[in-house]
């Protein structure tokens, strides 16, 4: 059963990432700026600095890899920091019922998508390890 929940979440979330990233280039006016001054200022700062364009490019690339079900551990690792900012924006900077729902769904989708790949992330939590300084692939 979880396999179907996983794949449904992957398609929905991947589609959302692709859509959200592409809409920035198709119709820039579509971008929600928020209703609270902090959310508006934050979004303007991202846009004015040029960082927002790179985030949207990443959203497109990662949405495609998620929909194609390729490089999932790397895709998820790249999406989590972006999601942390989005959840913060939804829950703290621009709090409203719809934003709470989107923030909560982002967390749920992340957990559902990360769970089957958890074994790939365990090595990242090694407290002390031996580095391999050789030039040969591991």
Each model region followed by its residue ranges:
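Extended, low-polarity transmembrane helix blocks
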Residues: 1-29, 53, 68-138
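Glutamate identity and glutamate-enriched acidic tracts
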Residues: 36, 59, 131-132
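Alpha-helix C-terminal capping segments
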Residues: 46, 67-68
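Interfacial helix-start motif at the membrane-water boundary
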Residues: 43-58
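Generic transmembrane alpha-helix motif of multi-pass integral membrane proteins
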Residues: 60-67
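Residue-level signal for transmembrane alpha-helical positions in Major Facilitator Superfamily
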Residues: 13, 58-59
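Membrane-interface interhelical connector segments
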Residues: 26-46
């Amino acid at each position: 059963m979880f396999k179907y929940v996983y794949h449904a979440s992957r398609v929905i979330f991947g589609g959302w990432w692709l859509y959200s990233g592409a809409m920035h280039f198709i119709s820039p006016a579509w971008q929600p700026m928020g209703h609270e001054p902090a959310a508006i200022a934050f979004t303007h700062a991202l846009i004015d600095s040029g960082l927002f364009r790179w985030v949207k490019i990443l959203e497109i690339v990662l949405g495609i890899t998620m929909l194609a079900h390729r490089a999932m551990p790397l895709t998820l690792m790249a999406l989590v920091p972006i999601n942390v900012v989005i959840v913060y924006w939804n829950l703290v900077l621009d709090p409203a019922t719809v934003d709470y729902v989107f923030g909560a769904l982002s967390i749920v989708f992340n957990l559902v998508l990360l769970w089957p790949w958890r074994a790939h992330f365990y090595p990242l939590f090694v407290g002390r390890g031996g580095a391999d300084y050789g030039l040969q692939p591991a």
